[in-house]
């Protein structure tokens, strides 16, 4: 018996030694091929962290998504943190500087290259190559912002197209026809004039036909420039083109609506209200994205949405997305990828759509009742999808954050009435070009 045990022990030792000399099957596979295994009895699941910006109510939705993910993947535990926009980016920069980043974090598409070029993001292409069907149902235009020569370092989770929100009650009372497909900027301007009124009879305008955020390009002026045949930035990302003759036509339109027609409040006037002028029932029209729908659903007036108007070069709108990235410093990239896969699945996309803030990137979900027949409010959701036909991707380039601040802050004095349009615009273009040169 003792001899049998000794022989068995020697054989077992030999097997262990031989096994140790052989390469691990996982070691010879790309990262995406490594499969997360259920924890052993009594073992602890792998913990990963996920950070995103958003309103407090979004945390509950993300937690629901996480709960469903964990039920399907008991070997992984996800902790979720949702912060407001400013706090989110400040904390993210601090964590990256300390080399303690969240495993997965949300990314605004225009800022993507600033992070990707710093080498702080994991290349997701090996994972995608292992699941080539993953992106087949994703709207192609939403992927454009995340492409790089060596693959994707991020993927979109949802997107926004900008449309015109309009107050049906104001239109009805003023006898103005609702916006129709194919309408123009001239149509919008004339409607805005009629809808701008002194409803109290005290000689002061208290109802505006149109209001818009002119600081960032996404909501108004990029659409205006594209529809007039202009561009925002050159294809090689070295020249700012917002001062071209075509672009100037769009700027002049907004300038005249504000200072000549008085149908659009200047920055000082709108700032006095301290409110969303459309939601407060002070403005009849505003261009904005789907993220306002849950908030606007509580409005006491009837409203709907219409496509952006056409200019001399046709219709145009902006498309932007929120995406996912995995930190290069993550110690659990495989598990982080599994979470992204789940959010991009029909189940994950359905849960995000139920929140009502954005448009799902999966066609099968976006073009289903899940999106088109949302319960929050009865509006023409199809307009957001139809706008893809003439949508331009919001530009993505290195130095975007600094460039947009130079443009937004530089043009701000025009909308307060402190400076003239053309000389200010020319100065801004020079400053913006300097940012591009610095980030080339």
Predicted regions and their residues:
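Hinge/lid segment of periplasmic solute-binding proteins
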Residues: 41, 109-163, 186-187, 224, ...
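Glycine-centered hinge/linker elements that transmit conformational signals in sensory
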Residues: 191-193, 236-268, 297-299
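Extracytoplasmic "Venus flytrap"/periplasmic binding protein-like
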Residues: 64, 68-138, 172-175, 275-277, ...
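A structural signal for short loop-to-beta-strand junctions that line the ligand-binding cleft
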Residues: 95, 100-103, 132-170, 203, ...
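Extracytoplasmic/periplasmic solute-binding protein
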Residues: 39, 149-157, 162, 186-239, ...
């Amino acid at each position: 018996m003792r001899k049998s045990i000794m022989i068995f022990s020697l054989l077992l030792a030999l097997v262990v030694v031989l096994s140790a000399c052989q390469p691990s099957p996982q070691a010879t596979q790309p990262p995406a091929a490594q499969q997360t295994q259920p924890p052993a009895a009594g073992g602890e699941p792998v913990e990963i962290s996920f950070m995103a910006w958003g309103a407090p109510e979004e945390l509950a939705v993300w937690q629901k998504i996480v709960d469903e993910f964990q039920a399907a993947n008991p070997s992984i535990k996800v902790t979720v943190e949702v912060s407001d926009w400013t706090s989110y980016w400040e904390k993210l920069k601090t964590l990256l500087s300390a080399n303690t980043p969240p495993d997965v974090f949300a990314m605004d598409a225009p800022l993507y290259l600033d992070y990707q070029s710093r080498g702080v993001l994991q290349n997701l292409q090996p994972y995608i190559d292992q699941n080539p069907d993953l992106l087949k149902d994703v709207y192609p235009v939403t992927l454009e912002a995340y492409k790089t020569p060596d693959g994707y370092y991020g993927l979109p989770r949802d997107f926004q197209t900008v449309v015109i929100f309009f107050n049906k009650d104001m239109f009805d009372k003023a006898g103005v026809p609702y916006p129709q497909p194919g309408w123009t900027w001239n149509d919008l301007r004339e409607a805005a004039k009629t809808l701008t009124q002194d409803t109290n009879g005290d000689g002061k305008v208290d109802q505006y036909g149109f209001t818009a955020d002119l600081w960032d390009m996404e909501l108004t002026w990029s659409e205006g420039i594209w529809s007039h045949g202009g561009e925002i930035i050159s294809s090689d990302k070295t020249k700012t083109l917002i001062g071209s003759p075509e672009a100037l036509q769009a700027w002049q339109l907004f300038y005249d609506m504000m200072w000549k027609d008085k149908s659009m409040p200047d920055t000082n006037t709108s700032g006095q209200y301290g409110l969303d002028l459309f939601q407060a029932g002070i403005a009849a029209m505003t261009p904005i994205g789907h993220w306002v729908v849950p908030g606007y659903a509580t409005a006491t007036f009837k409203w709907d949405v219409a496509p952006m108007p056409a200019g001399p070069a046709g219709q145009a709108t902006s498309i932007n997305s929120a995406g996912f990235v995995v930190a290069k410093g993550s110690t659990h990239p495989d598990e982080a990828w599994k979470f992204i896969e789940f959010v991009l699945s029909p189940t994950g996309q359905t849960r995000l759509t139920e929140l009502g803030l954005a448009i799902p990137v999966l066609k099968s979900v976006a073009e289903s009742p899940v999106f088109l027949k949302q319960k929050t409010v009865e509006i023409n959701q199809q307009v957001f999808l139809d706008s893809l036909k003439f949508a331009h991707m919001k530009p993505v380039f290195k130095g975007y954050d600094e460039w947009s601040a130079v443009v937004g802050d530089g043009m701000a004095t025009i909308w307060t009435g402190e400076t003239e349009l053309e000389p200010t615009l020319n100065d801004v273009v020079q400053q913006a070009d300097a940012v591009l040169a610095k980030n080339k």
